[in-house]
């Protein structure tokens, strides 16, 4: 196994965890939330995706390397709006595998949390 590297952009955390771990070309991002950008699903989703972009960049990666995404929402009624924002964020890259769930609560009163896994240089153009 390669050396385990911490991925961190210095953002405040709500617990004892590392925002991301990188081993060789495999990248795992802890669940990301954004409660600073606003209290609505649109601003929190956009802010959370921006945090993911920043963490992936810190690992010399990008959203094109994502292979698995898990989305947690406190209201499944957000699903359509989250999909619109997520689709726009992805652009024309191959979408990663994904699951989305409704949960009763998230840390800090967040409305959405997104967990990601990536393999650096996995971007394939069709």
Q: Model features per residue range: what roles?
A:
Residues 1-67, 73-123:
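N-terminal presequence-like segments and the immediate start of the first folded domain
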């Amino acid at each position: 196994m390669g050396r385990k590297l911490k991925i961190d952009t210095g953002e405040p955390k709500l617990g004892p965890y590392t925002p991301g771990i990188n081993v060789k070309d495999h990248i795992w991002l802890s669940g990301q939330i954004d409660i600073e950008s606003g209290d609505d699903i649109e601003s929190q989703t956009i802010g959370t995706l921006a945090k993911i972009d920043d963490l992936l960049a810190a690992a010399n990666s990008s959203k094109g390397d994502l292979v698995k995404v898990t989305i947690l929402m406190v209201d499944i009624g957000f699903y359509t709006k989250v999909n619109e924002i997520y689709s726009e964020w992805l652009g024309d890259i191959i979408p990663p595998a994904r699951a989305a769930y409704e949960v009763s609560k998230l840390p800090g009163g967040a409305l959405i949390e997104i967990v990601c896994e990536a393999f650096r240089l996995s971007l394939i153009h069709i």
